[in-house]
Amino acid sequence: MAGGVIVANDGDGSAVDHGGRLTFSVVITCLVAASGGLIFGYDVGISGGVSTMEPFLRRFFPGVVRRMAEARPGNEYCVYDSQALTAFTSSLYVAGLVASLVASRVTRAMGRQAVMVMGGALFFAGGAVTGFAVNIAMLIVGRMLLGFGVGFTNQAAPLFLAEMAPTRWRGSLTAGFQFFLAVGVVIATVTNYFASRVPWGWRLSLGLAGAPAVVIFLGALFLTDTPSSLVMRGDTARARAALLRVRGAGADVEAELKGIVRAVEVARQGEDGAFRRMAARREYRPYLVFAVAMPMFFQLTGVIVISFFSPLVFRTVGFGSNAALMGNVILGAVNLVCLMLSTLVIDRYGRKVLFMVGGAIMIIAQVGVAWIMGAQVGKNGSEAMARPYAVAVVAFTCLHTAGFGWSWGPLGWVIPGEIFPVDIRSAGQAMNVSIGLGLTFVQTQSFLAMLCRFRYGTFAYYAAWVAVMTVFIAVFLPETKGVPLESMATVWARHWYWKRFAREQPKTSADEPTGTY
């Protein structure tokens, strides 16, 4: 591809793994970076539960409380349909979208580590404002500060993980971001469950967002930036020191550093206009397609709206407030367990196997929820659901969450973090994050209205999308397991379809210097 990098290979075009153990230093470094997902996960999990707390609703959304009191049979799907209530959740993602675009340039100019520090500070400020909110304006401002933190952290952390991790461990370590996101969701749901028992519990739930913010802020202060970022900013000596520390004995640090330096030299030749190159140049077509497709499909799995609104869905099918919150805790725990299992096998069996299995599970689950709600709640929401069927809805929702945790949960962060060449890596990640946040805003703002208008068909809608994305991944995604970042163009150039766009890397001996083409 134009602006690509020729890295050392073994003579048949395949990339060389420069080695590197799973050292204590790389584990600690990646744990701190991945903890950015903890804050995002906490914010994902907290808003849906808080939205079911009656003291919170009475203070900020009294119209919803009146609608709940006046609800008659036939209105179960529409009780929570409030644009103001969904704006409380979705405002975070408008701010995150804007911040992610700015963060692309900031990440390139100041480094990944500095952006994570900024993200932690913004998260802390947002948690403080929402925790002490006295009106809707303060709630929205606080959520927007949290959104700016999301935009910065989601831009920097996956890149940090992908660039720091040894090739053979890159999938598992990059998936750590989603693992911590799932941990954050579980912490949020447990917090909501216990906080709902006191009138001021909603303040506790919202304000505690500041706690994980302190973790990433202080942790990031002590991190060294990634070798790629240091080389891009002209500090090759620190880049070498960083590689020596995180790779350990036995790694060919000098060869890896040479590859990074050459990649950065190519990146500087086309430093400006990365977005324009992605859009205009034929050889960048695979990266452009996946920069759009990955975040779009990630959102259309339906897991985001389930994470936000599952307490409201559970109340819709007949559970009380506490039972609905406990159901959300169970969902978070299921997601976390499946993420742990996925992380253990992602670098053994590859990415595509996990996508296929997870996709099949999610389709079955969404169809099951649609069928039960259509048969038991009725087309107009006029029927009361028997408890066994309500439990089945929870079970199918857990199954969907399990499928997501096995596949798109970790891989939705792993794939975008590893497929882009260095000259468009920041731009590609910015596009991935901004599209994802933009679609999250659209979905969170529209889901309750969709549930009210399309009723059980909402879940069939998501099942259809999961079927589409599973076929797309099977056909168009090359397997990236075990491929060094600097050699990623090789797998695209050999793919049955993308080879007409991407270019094969010329063969060189392992000790030959690399160049550009």
From Swiss-Prot:
Subcellular location: Membrane
Keyword Transmembrane: yes
Protein keywords: Membrane, Sugar transport, Symport, Transmembrane, Transmembrane helix, Transport
Membrane topology of the entry: Multi-pass membrane protein
Keyword Transcription regulation attributed: no
Residue ranges annotated as Extracellular topological domain: 47-83, 142-143, 192-203, 310-325, 374-389, 452-456
Entries under PANTHER family matching the protein: SOLUTE CARRIER FAMILY 2, FACILITATED GLUCOSE TRANSPORTER, SUGAR TRANSPORT PROTEIN MST1
Entries under NCBIfam families matching the protein: SP
Protein name: Sugar transport protein MST1
Classification lineage: Eukaryota, Viridiplantae, Streptophyta, Embryophyta, Tracheophyta
